[in-house]
Design a protein with these regions (language model features):
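Non-cytosolic membrane-interface motifs at loop->transmembrane helix junctions
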Residues: 80-88, 141-152, 294-296, 345-352
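Membrane-interfacial loop-to-transmembrane alpha-helix junctions, especially the N-terminal start
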Residues: 49-62, 109-125, 175-187, 263-274, ...
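Long, hydrophobic/aromatic-enriched structural stretches that serve as scaffold segments
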Residues: 101, 105-139, 155-158
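Generic multipass alpha-helical transmembrane bundles of integral membrane proteins
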Residues: 150-158, 162-296
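Hydrophobic cores of alpha-helical transmembrane segments in multi-pass inner/ER membrane proteins
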Residues: 88-105, 153-169, 244-258, 299-312, ...
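N-terminal signal-anchor module of multipass membrane proteins
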Residues: 2-99, 366
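Short, highly charged, low-complexity non-transmembrane loops/tails of multi-pass membrane proteins
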Residues: 372-404, 408-421
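Aromatic-anchored segments of alpha-helical transmembrane domains
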Residues: 63-68, 124-134, 188-199, 273-286, ...
Length: 422
């Protein structure tokens, strides 16, 4: 008679974050057992679970933000970038995002169907862009400009997946300070991603000045390779016309702040986001200088426009009025910064078309916000069907927090813990 089989030791949740880090294998086993079970979008998610999930999103995008900032500076110094530290940071963040999207797709926690589809479309676009970018390098040689189609796919995919994360958190987090802080963090990453293409000119204008002064930080092989590709130093460091930087800053980045201000709802949302972003860039500037990497110009004019955005939304000004005021003040602030310091090349004649275009975009946003589509967007889509009392992933009674109904933003979505496989 064979000896009785000993039962497998129970896998318990770590008692603290320190214990979780001390025993990572046990942590993974516990997470896999309790949370990697099939479920539909809208699955019951407690407040604590929601905070942990979206904290992981914040960490992932923090890695991507630091990596991308360093990567731009890296490409103004070195030609080689295989296994470069900024690429490794960015890749670590991307790997975390892939894991999170797989988790949401399989388990259904913390997202509705629309948020999940945005996350999936975003990471899919990003991953498809990687081989396209590699092929672009093989066919066209050196391509460090952030304005190339393959690079545009990368930050477009990032924007789409961030939109999904913003939606998921805003739908299911209970109103309060935690909801506002995490939302501000996600919107900060969205703003940084929107501003990312403009960094080429912001690094390039200083690198070109150093080159002309005979003090370039770029290695000779980088400049030689650029010349072999038929590019002059000016074309290499400032690859787009001088109307592009102001047009993108106003029509894309300020519009991002308008949407963030409307969604988050705090009075100084746009100002806080712009100031935090500029503070981050200032710290990065100092660290890059210490490390011998090229620094960049800071787009301080963004802060002036952000203040006007907050005031215009608070005063309930029509979009065409707010757009003219915010765009005009941004151009005036840029002119002052140009007189006192340095900015990338701006075509000042573009002020009229850019400000008018921004006013039209803001007015269109006002109209969209009043539409039936916008009203339907605020409600969760295709939640998991209710099936009795809420339970967690292993059938225990779930710690369901109180909150608004599932049809309202901020709902925690109380549904059955175990959902059928999709």
């Amino acid at each position: 008679v064979s000896a009785p089989t000993r039962p497998a030791p129970a896998v318990t949740a770590p008692a603290s974050p320190r214990e979780a880090l001390r025993h990572p294998v046990q942590l993974v086993r516990w997470l896999w057992r309790d949370y990697m079970t099939p479920g539909l979008p809208g699955r019951a998610t407690t407040a604590t679970e929601l905070r942990w999930i979206y904290t992981a999103w914040l960490v992932a995008f923090a890695l991507k933000m630091v990596g991308s900032t360093w990567d731009v500076s890296w490409h103004f110094r070195w030609l080689r970038d295989d296994l470069a530290p900024p690429h490794l940071l960015n890749s670590a963040g991307t790997a975390m995002v892939v894991g999170l999207v797989v988790f949401h797709s399989y388990a259904g926690y913390g997202v509705d169907r629309r948020a999940l589809r945005l996350m999936q479309a975003g990471i899919g676009t990003f991953l498809v862009a990687i081989p396209i970018d590699l092929l672009n390098h093989r066919l066209n040689g050196l391509d460090i400009t952030s304005w190339s189609p393959s690079h545009a796919l990368l930050y477009t995919g990032t924007a789409i997946m961030l939109a999904g994360a913003i939606r998921g958190w805003w739908l299911y987090a209970a109103p309060g300070r935690t909801r506002d802080r995490v939302s501000l963090g996600l919107w900060l990453f969205f703003l940084e991603n929107a501003l990312f293409p403009n960094q080429h000119q912001e690094y390039g204008v200083l690198s070109l000045a150093d080159y002309r002064a005979g003090q370039t930080t770029a290695e000779p092989s980088l400049l030689d390779f650029a010349l072999s590709q038929g590019q002059t130093p000016t074309q290499f460091m400032l690859p787009v016309p001088p109307w592009v930087h102001p047009a993108w800053l106003v029509c894309v980045c300020l519009l991002t702040l308008v949407v963030a201000r409307r969604v988050v709802g705090l009075r100084w949302t746009a100002t806080l986001l712009a100031a935090t972003y500029l503070g981050y860039r200032a710290v990065a500037w100092g660290l890059l200088e210490v490390g011998g990497f090229p620094p960049s110009v800071l787009p301080v004019m963004l802060l002036a426009g952000a203040v006007v955005v907050d005031l215009a939304v608070t005063r309930r000004l029509p979009g065409w009025v707010g757009g003219v005021l915010a765009g005009g003040v941004t151009f005036l602030a840029a002119l002052v910064q140009d007189l006192l310091a340095v900015i990338p090349p701006w075509n000042w004649w573009s002020a009229g078309p850019v400000v008018l275009g921004f006013a039209v975009l803001w007015a269109g946003l006002d109209r969209l916000e009043r539409s039936a589509w916008a009203a339907s967007w605020r409600a969760p889509v295709e939640l998991a069907p209710a099936a009795g009392p809420a339970t967690d992933a292993v059938g225990r009674a779930a710690d369901v927090p109180a909150g608004p109904s599932a049809a309202e933003p901020g709902s925690h979505v109380v549904r059955s813990g175990r959902s059928p496989r999709r």
